[in-house]
C-alpha cells in the first residue's frame, strides 16, 4: 500500500541530507505525500510558501528568522526586575521550554529548523554546516539539571550589563537563524528598532524571505 506521511517530528527532515532526499524521492516515486509543515513555525505556512515560490520560478537568496518561541519569550522577559535565570525558570514553568531548558538554550532545535528551511530553499545543508554560536558557556550543558539550575544565576550579572547596554542603544535581543546562500548560522543578535525582528512579541516566530523577486522588500511571515 502507498500511504502518505505527515511528520510532526523534525528529525527526519533535518537528519542526514541523503536520508532526507531519499524520503522525498520515495514519496515522489510512490505518488504519495511527505509533509512536515509544522516542523518549522508551528502552524505558520513557511515551508509551503518557500515551495510555492520555488515552484513559480523564484529563487530563495536569504532567510532570516526567529524560530524558537521559547528563546524569544526568554529574551522578551528579561528586564531590570527579571534576570536571565528567572526568565528561563518562567519559560519552563509556563511550558514554553522543554523540561530540561538546556535543550532550548543549546540552539539545536533552531539549527534543525534552519536546516529544513535551507533544504526546502534548494541548498544541500547538514546540521554540522551551521555555525552555531552559544550565548552561555559550554559547561552549562554538562552535568545534571539540578547543577544547571544552581549555576544559572551566575550569568545574571553579565546578562544585566549587556541588557543595559542594549537599552542605551535602543536595541533588543533576538536569537536569529540566518541562511545567506550556502552559509547558515544561528546566533544571539542585537537588533535595532528599524529591523523587522525588533517588535516580535512573546513567543512569536518570524521569517523574512529574500528572493529574486522579493529582493528589496523581503516577504515576511509572522505569528504563532
Residue ranges and their predicted role:
Residues 1-7:
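Rossmann-fold NAD(P) dinucleotide-binding segment
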Residues 62-64, 72-75, 90, 175-224:
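Catalytic, metal-anchored helix/loop core of enzyme active sites in primary metabolism
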Amino acid at each position: 500500500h502507498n500511504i502518505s506521511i505527515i511528520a510532526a517530528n523534525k528529525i527526519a527532515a533535518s537528519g542526514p541530507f541523503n536520508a532526507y532526499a531519499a524520503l522525498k524521492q520515495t514519496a515522489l516515486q510512490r505518488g504519495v505525500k511527505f509533509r512536515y509543515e509544522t516542523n518549522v513555525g508551528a502552524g505558520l505556512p513557511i515551508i509551503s510558501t518557500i515551495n510555492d515560490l520555488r515552484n513559480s520560478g523564484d529563487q530563495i537568496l536569504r532567510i532570516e528568522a526567529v524560530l524558537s518561541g521559547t528563546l524569544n519569550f526568554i529574551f522578551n522577559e528579561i528586564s531590570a526586575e527579571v534576570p536571565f535565570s528567572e526568565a528561563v525558570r518562567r519559560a519552563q514553568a509556563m511550558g514554553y521550554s522543554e523540561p530540561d531548558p538546556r535543550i532550548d538554550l543549546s540552539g539545536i532545535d533552531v539549527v534543525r529548523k534552519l536546516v529544513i528551511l535551507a533544504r526546502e530553499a534548494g541548498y544541500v545543508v547538514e546540521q554540522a554546516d551551521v555555525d552555531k554560536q552559544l550565548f552561555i558557556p559550554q559547561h552549562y550543558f554538562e552535568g545534571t539539571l539540578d547543577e544547571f539550575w544552581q549555576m544559572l544565576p551566575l550569568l545574571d550579572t553579565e546578562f544585566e550589563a549587556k541588557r543595559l547596554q542594549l537599552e542605551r542603544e535602543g536595541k533588543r535581543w533576538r536569537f536569529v537563524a540566518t541562511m545567506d546562500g550556502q552559509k547558515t548560522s544561528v546566533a544571539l543578535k542585537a537588533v535595532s528598532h528599524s529591523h523587522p525582528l525588533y517588535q516580535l512579541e512573546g513567543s512569536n516566530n518570524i521569517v523574512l524571505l529574500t528572493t529574486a523577486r522579493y529582493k528589496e522588500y523581503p516577504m515576511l511571515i509572522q505569528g504563532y
